Amino acid sequence: MQLNSTEISDLIKQRIEKFNVVTEARNEGTIVSVSDGIINIHGLADVMQGEMIELPGGRYALALNLNRDSVGAVVMGPYADLQEGMKVTGTGRILEVPVGPELLGRVVNTLGEPIDGKGPIEAKLTSPVEVIAPGVIDRKSVDQPVQTGYKSVDSMIPIGRGQRELIIGDRQTGKTAMAIDAIINQKDSGIFSIYVAIGQKASTIANVVRKLEEHGALANTIVVVASASESAALQYLAPYSGCAMGEYFRDRGEDALIVYDDLSKQAVAYRQISLLLKRPPGREAFPGDVFYLHSRLLERAARVSEAYVERFTNGEVTGKTGSLTALPIIETQAGDVSAFVPTNVISITDGQIFLQTELFTAGVRPAVDPGISVSRVGGSAQTKIIKKLSGGIRTALAQYRELAAFAQFSSDLDDATKKQLDHGEKVTELMKQKQYAPMSVFDQALVIFAAEKGYLKDVELAKLADFEEALLSYARGQFADLAKEIDTSGAWNNEIEAQFVKLVEDFKATQTW
């Protein structure tokens, strides 16, 4: 078959017309070094701080060091098979995680992927993990309580919705137990909970999830896990992921509580990443921006105004404030609260609950030290009845500690001192509480009332726990309406006081202690 020149030119023209040119610009680079989960990339032109970089095999790395001729990125996941010369691509996206009510009752990893074997999560929305905290104008003052269910905390160190209250202490002093009990106490309060586990053993986390499920609190809780076996990058990012999930509720006029367990391990993970990225070390080998690491996280816990919620939801939610309350946990070494990370977090938060090893081993649990534990903004959020009744509790405990130390050197004490010691001893005993047994407002108020009004003078110290249990059981049976009213309103007036007096006196008349 022979073609003349005209036919050949026509065929070429047809082919040219039909030829579909697809141009796709890809921001591509090459891995030049891989070590300890850190990759250096050459050739990526436009990269943002914190951008997701796509790696071979569907994995991602996070761009953290932006140098003149290279990019330092930390791999999120396994990195053993990455090699020099591999091609990587910039995505132009900041890390986002799924958010929304679909995550409640689930256990997820740092990236929001389910790890509980209950199937995929059909979340409709995603949110960036790094968000600027609400400004001063967008905030409201903290004046609504978060009941932890602990007598010692709710009476002496009250926590409000939108507050940041640090739980600090040595290892094995009950920090996680306190945070888990606070979450369990929210199951009927309308507050959603997020528990972020950072650098813990998988067995410990599994135990926490099981306890939440047993006590019916998992259904309104999201558990975010970055266990000890996961990379430093995922441990560093886990609190920000959990915070983004909590902000979903805050920004829509709901209330949420987030526990970071614990930020010491997050700081260590960030130190590891920073040193591998060859950033200059500072005090205790932490990088210079370790304060900013925690401040930008904890400032996102806030109570936001009605106008902020209305603006965020485009008018769908009106007249409601939202809040995110944070309970960060810090582990100290031999009670040293003056170390770098503890002092940073103490200065960022609105107060701290200090748990002491000496108290814990002496059987005072929760091991709260009332001397150096404080809540800077929770007082205005405290329930009215608890605020009215608990004024003398902290004083009684402080005086008792002082006198107990003095009494060791003196055998003959006057009657007033003996009374103070006896009262302080009984208040200390009364503040003890079992794990997984948070108390309602009414129960706390009744026990504190009995202590403050002198109804425990004739009760032996050894029988105090039985007295408390019997009193609460009697009150729930005979004064159910009063209990319901106080649990709902938290009010205090002369009429309620008279009913309390009648309740305790009737109880003491029926039984001998």
Curated annotation (Swiss-Prot):
It comes from the Bacteria. Keywords: ATP synthesis, ATP-binding, Cell inner membrane, Cell membrane, CF(1), Hydrogen ion transport, Ion transport, Membrane, Nucleotide-binding, Translocase, Transport. It catalyses: ATP + H2O + 4 H(+)(in) = ADP + phosphate + 5 H(+)(out). InterPro entries: ATP_synth_asu-like_sf (IPR023366), ATP_synth_asu_C (IPR000793), ATP_synth_asu_C_sf (IPR038376), ATP_synth_F1_a_nt-bd_dom (IPR033732), ATP_synth_F1_asu (IPR005294), ATPase_a/bsu_AS (IPR020003), ATPase_F1/V1/A1_a/bsu_N (IPR004100), ATPase_F1/V1/A1_a/bsu_N_sf (IPR036121). The record marks 373 as: Required for activity. It is found in: Cell inner membrane. Its EC number is 7.1.2.2. This is ATP synthase subunit alpha.
